Structure formats: structure tokens, C-alpha cells
Amino acid sequence: MTITAHMTPDTLDATFFALSSDLRRRVLDLLKREPGCNVNRVAEVFASEVGRFAIMKHLAVLELGGLVVSQREGRERRLWFDATPIQLIHERWTTEFSV
């Protein structure tokens, strides 16, 4: 199955945009190490660099790119890294464009 079956050009662009920021990539690293952590934990880890509002904006970009899945539990929002878009991109460039 090709990437076009799973991702539109807009979602592909959103994924690449989400990955274009070093901070967002480090947020993904955190979510990989600590799956299901809450927004407060992410804000705490990066507090010396950016404020909570900026973290919320970065998380929104990651969600639009399909790289973060969130689930509300009461007043908390739990977060997980979803590598599916990266796997689909990898599939495209290793299968569709291979010699």
C-alpha cells in the first residue's frame, strides 16, 4: 500500500512541518520515552526553553501532523507518539522511489 492511500498532500506537508522543529522532535523523543505522559509533564521538561502556551502550540502542530495522539482523562490530557506517518513516508521513499 502506498503513502497516497494513507496521506493526502496536505497531511504529508503537515507531518514534514511538524518534524521541521528541533523542539517538536525533542517532544516526540520525550513521548517515546514516556508514553502517556500528560501536557504538564511536557511543559515541565521544556520549561527552561519555552512556556506552557508555546508547548500547547507545538503539541497542536504535532497532532495536525499525525505524530501525536491525545486522550482526555478527566482534567488531564495524555499524549502518545504515533510513528505511523513517519513509517508511511519511509515506505514511500524506500519502495515507490527505489531503483
Give, region by region, the residue ranges found by the protein language model:
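Short, hydrophobic-biased segments on the C-terminal half of alpha helices
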Residues: L59-A60
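A general boundary/transition motif marking the beginning of the first structured unit of a protein
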Residues: M7, T15, R92-E96
